[in-house]
Amino acid sequence: MTANAQRWKRILKVRAVQRQLAELQLHRCEKEVRNLVDLGHRISAIRAAAQPLVGAQSGMMLRSVCELSSRLDTAQRALATPSRNAQEARNRQRHAVVAARQRETA
């Protein structure tokens, strides 16, 4: 095998590993986004379940529900940034996977 052929063989192996790593990271990002979306749905369900309690209970319960609602709002705001970051990372990884595949075929 010529030196050039060996060089290209090594390059293709490295690119294949890079593509596999990019796909793995993409899978992890997608899983994180699914988890964040699931958490958002749970927060919405808790908020919906807490609303009937506001009219039925004393002022102390009202304060507790308001505190819970405030905490849920804070959690939802905290969810927005990681979700957006995960989406951006997912897009970057998709581009990296496509670029790696194009380099392999080039």
Model regions and ranges:
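Charge-rich amphipathic alpha-helical interaction elements
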Residues: M1-A106
